[in-house]
Amino acid sequence: MPTTREQILQALLARLETIPGATAKREAPLPETVPVGGLIVLRDGDPGEPEMLVSPPTYLWQHKAEIEVIVSRGAGDANTALDGLLMAVGQALEADRSLGGLADWLDWGAPKTHDLAIDGAAGLKGAVVPVTIHYASTNPLG
C-alpha cells in the first residue's frame, strides 16, 4: 500500500485531472508544445520536517508542493488563458480541500507568473502556484 504522502499526491493529481480541457501530469518535463487547453504539472515538492506526537507516534506534515500552469502564447491572449486556467485550478482545489479525507487541509498561495523560453518551443506563459498540504502519518517516511 502506498504511503500517505503518495496517496495524497495521487489524489491531488486526480483533482487537477478534473479540469476540463487541460492536461494534468505529475513531475513531467517542460514540453516544447502545450496542449490547446493548457498544461498543469504537479511537482511533488518537499514534505519538510514533521512535528512528532509520541503517543501514539504521529507525524504532522506541512508538505510544500507546486502546481505549474502553462499556456501557449500562440493563439489569443495568453494572459487571459492563463488567468482562466488558474481560476479552474483554484476551483478544483477548493472543491475538496481534504482530498477525500486523506489530508487535514489543503492551502495554496498566489501564483507567480513568468514567460517561458524553451529551445525550439513556441512562446509559453506560465505560473507556479505554491500548495501546502497538511496531513498526519504514523510513519516518518510519510
Question: What are the residue ranges of the model-derived segments?
Answer:
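Generic preference for hydrophobic
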Residues: V41-L42
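Charged, amphipathic alpha-helical segments and their flanking helix caps
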Residues: M1-V36, G45-G142
